[in-house]
């Protein structure tokens, strides 16, 4: 049976009734336990305070009665009471301040130093021996004083803390301005797997201080020198056709626009083609003659390019899409204190150095960036020159087609041809006369030439609804036919200046006026 009872006593419950771990780790449960502990401590302190208060009252009564008895003049002491009182006051300096005259007699007020809770013998007055036992015969038989001493302990201090403790505060007149504490502490959430902490933006003043704390500009010359050597090898490509050329009116001289003040150096080769100079300045360097920005601003641009290149090298991506997004983000970040045009110019040069843009596109970009205004001024003149050349070419082509058509006359008399200009070649033979007459016949009899209009230089519509009858008179021999065709081919140069050019005035087709042109009239002699 003992074994049986031991098993019963040592048996454990099937359900775990112990305090769960979550309760011990709970903040709410810990606060509840702490509040309960504080309540118990407060109750114990109140009880001790009541006991100490009653003990302090009895001790104060004993001390006051003893002091009053000691102030009375004994029989064997001198008669001068003033001297005696001064000696007693100097002997007890703590009670000298507590003497307050009142109509009911001497009233002793407890000094401020005694307002604090008594410790040691004052807590337990029953065990403490009396301090002055020699004088206990008289005050026991005297009646108790009606005025008892009370300890006043102020729990809440009265008055303003800034006025009471002004020495502990500085600038008490300044208004309250809350400040954000900047620390290097990391968030607890940064330990989680799917949490991406916010990136801290670098202050502009810190970047400027870093730039100013650098050494002289000579420290950057080594890096710029290597970049200049690399870029000078790629810049030895000649620009065959530059868009900033102006063609002078009648002459064919090509003169480049002035490049002074544009920070671009050009050399003229032997063939007359302009080429960029071999010593091409890097994208972050400018000529000292046209230097606008100060040294501090140049350092800011250098730090801007340094941040861009550092981020590119850190991520290791060099695609065009990535670079465009990265450049735009840095431009938006620095556009408030840096010039956007210069930033784009520097970033474009960086793209060329990275190989994302060819050198030809770089040269065209620079030329467009520097001379877009001059190009806008000369575009109208170039357009007029191109239109004039197109008109002249079209005229020569039409005259050449007409001469080729007339020179290739078929031997068959019954054949008739219809050409795009509606030239009709009815061939009939007259034996008595030897000559070729080519005459253009128009419906109207007005032979006045229309004035030339520069706005409508095209003459392709001028030959519509015109009929040209060509009478070919052949001789008896084939030799005359061959000779006639040769003479017609030689007339190409003499026809072009003598024929006036018709034009179309106005925008409607109803205002067209057709002119009668005499193409040629000649007689072939033997």
Swiss-Prot record:
- Highest taxon, organism lineage: Eukaryota
Residue ranges under compositional bias (Polar residues)? 212-224
> Among its keywords, does the record have Cytoplasm?
yes
Q: Which controlled-vocabulary keywords does the entry list? A: Cell projection, Cytoplasm, Cytoskeleton
Task: Provide the residue span(s) of the region labelled Disordered.
Answer: 203-240
GO cellular component, as recorded: axoneme; ciliary basal body; microtubule cytoskeleton; photoreceptor connecting cilium; photoreceptor distal connecting cilium; rod photoreceptor outer segment
Q: Name one GO biological process term.
A: photoreceptor cell maintenance
Which tissues show it?
A: In early prophase of primary spermatocytes.
What residue intervals traverse the membrane?
none
Task: Provide the protein's localization.
Answer: Cytoplasm, Cytoskeleton, Cilium axoneme; Cytoplasm, Cytoskeleton, Cilium basal body; Cytoplasm, Cytoskeleton; Cell projection, Cilium, Photoreceptor outer segment
Question: Bias regions of kind Basic and acidic residues — which residues?
Answer: 226-237
The subunit structure is: Found in a complex with CFAP410, NEK1 and SPATA7. Interacts with NEK1. Interacts with RPGRIP1. Interacts with RPGR. Interacts with NPHP4. Interacts with NPHP1. Interacts with AHI1.
Which function does this protein serve? Answer: Involved in the maintenance of both rod and cone photoreceptor cells. Required for photoreceptor-specific localization of proximal connecting cilium (CC) proteins RPGR, AHI1, NPHP1, NPHP4, and RPGRIP1 at the distal CC, a photoreceptor-specific extension of the primary cilium transition zone. Maintenance of protein localization at the photoreceptor-specific distal CC is essential for normal microtubule stability and to prevent photoreceptor degeneration.
The entry's protein name is: Spermatogenesis-associated protein 7 homolog
Q: What is the lineage of its organism?
A: Eukaryota, Metazoa, Chordata, Craniata, Vertebrata
């Amino acid at each position: 049976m003992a074994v049986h009872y031991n098993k019963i006593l040592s048996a454990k419950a099937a359900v775990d009734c112990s305090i769960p771990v979550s309760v011990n780790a709970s903040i709410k449960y810990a606060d509840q336990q702490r509040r309960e502990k504080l309540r118990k401590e407060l109750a114990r302190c109140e009880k001790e305070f009541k006991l100490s208060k009653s003990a302090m009252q009895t001790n104060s009564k004993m001390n006051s009665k003893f002091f009053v008895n000691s102030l009375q003049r004994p029989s064997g002491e001198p008669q001068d009471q003033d001297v005696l009182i001064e000696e007693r006051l100097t002997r007890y300096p703590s009670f000298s301040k507590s003497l307050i005259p009142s109509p009911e007699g001497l009233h002793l007020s407890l000094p401020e130093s005694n307002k604090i809770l008594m410790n040691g013998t004052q807590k337990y007055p029953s065990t403490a021996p009396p301090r002055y036992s020699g004088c206990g015969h008289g005050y026991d038989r005297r009646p108790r004083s009606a005025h008892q001493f009370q300890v006043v302990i102020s729990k809440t201090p009265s008055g303003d803390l800034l006025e009471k403790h002004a020495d502990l505060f500085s600038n008490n007149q300044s208004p309250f301005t809350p400040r954000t504490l900047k620390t290097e502490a990391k968030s607890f959430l940064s330990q989680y797997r799917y949490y991406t902490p916010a990136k801290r933006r670098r202050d502009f003043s810190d970047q400027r201080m870093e730039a100013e704390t650098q050494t002289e500009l000579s420290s950057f010359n080594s890096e710029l020198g290597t970049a200049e050597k690399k870029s000078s090898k790629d810049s030895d490509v000649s620009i065959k056709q530059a868009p900033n050329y102006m063609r002078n009116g009648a002459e064919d001289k090509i003169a480049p626009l002035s490049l002074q003040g544009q920070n671009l150096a050009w050399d003229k080769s032997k063939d007359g083609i302009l080429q960029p100079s071999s010593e091409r300045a890097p994208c972050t360097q400018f000529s000292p003659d046209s230097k606008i920005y100060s040294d501090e601003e140049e350092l800011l641009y250098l730090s801007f390019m340094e941040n861009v290149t550092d981020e590119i090298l850190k991520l290791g991506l060099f695609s065009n899409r990535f670079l465009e997004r990265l450049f735009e983000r840095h431009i938006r970040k620095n556009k408030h204190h840096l010039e956007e045009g210069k930033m784009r110019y520097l970033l474009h040069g960086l793209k060329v150095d990275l190989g994302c843009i060819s050198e030809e596109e770089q040269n065209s970009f620079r030329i467009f960036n520097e001379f877009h205004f001059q190009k806008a001024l000369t575009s109208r003149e170039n357009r007029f020159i191109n239109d004039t050349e197109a008109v002249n070419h079209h005229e020569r082509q039409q005259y050449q087609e007409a001469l080729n058509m007339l020179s290739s006359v078929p031997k068959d008399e019954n054949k008739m041809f219809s050409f795009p200009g509606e030239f009709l070649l009815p061939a009939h033979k007259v034996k008595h006369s030897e000559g070729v007459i080519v005459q253009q016949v128009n419906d109207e009899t007005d032979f006045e030439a229309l004035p030339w209009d520069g706005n409508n230089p095209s003459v392709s519509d001028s030959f519509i609804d015109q009929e040209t009858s060509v009478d070919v008179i052949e001789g008896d021999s084939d030799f005359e036919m061959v000779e006639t065709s040769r003479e017609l081919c030689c007339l190409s140069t003499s026809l072009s200046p003598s024929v006036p050019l018709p034009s179309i005035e106005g925008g409607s087709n109803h205002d067209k006026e057709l002119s009668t042109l005499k193409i040629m009239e000649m007689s072939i002699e033997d």
